[in-house]
């Protein structure tokens, strides 16, 4: 269970990160269609691995849906450890995928999402929703268009449940229950080091 960290300017996530982390704990709490709470705690180790835990760095670690990328949004240091809050990397689309005037018209879920993610080829989407609907997105980012209070948001019009999978968002009729994964490190941990609560 390698946890890799990538410096903020490093976007080559296919390769190993700038450093391997050995956190004391890493938790992914995935609320279906809600906020994902991701927390990482790391000792202030002599090798200085902890110094790589900076705002906007990206951490690659195992989650309930395979290896996932999370971006650090906040960090706090105490005398003995550093704690970081992270979010799925798909949330980057708040800042780099804008829908200026996008109108999926008489489209099913997949067709609508293909149109909505088109402004930035970095992102993609998958959906099994067959319902045909129309929506209108003007001057909003992709996250707002997918899941916000806006009456045109994808979830309000097509329904479904959101799961983030790196640069892909999966919105299916039923995604399952809220998932939580705690990844623990140290000597007294099972082989794969993962405990999963559903």
PLM features per residue range, with description:
Residues 3-5, 38-40, 59, 72, ...:
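Hydrophobic beta-strand residues in large extracellular and virion-surface proteins
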Residues 3-11, 45-78, 103-118, 152:
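Short, acidic/charged, Gly/Pro-enriched secondary-structure junctions
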Residues 27-36, 74-82, 163-167:
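Short, ordered beta-strand-loop transition motifs
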Residues 12-21, 58-67, 146-156, 190:
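Short, solvent-exposed secondary-structure boundary motifs
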Residues 5, 197-198:
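Leucine-centric amphipathic alpha-helical interface motifs
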Residues 1-52, 87-93:
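Juxtamembrane "anchor/assembly" segments of surface/extracellular structural proteins
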Residues 80-197:
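Charged- and aromatic-enriched interaction segments used to assemble
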Residues 23, 72-74, 189, 195:
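A structural signal for short, hydrophobic beta-strand segments that form beta-sheets
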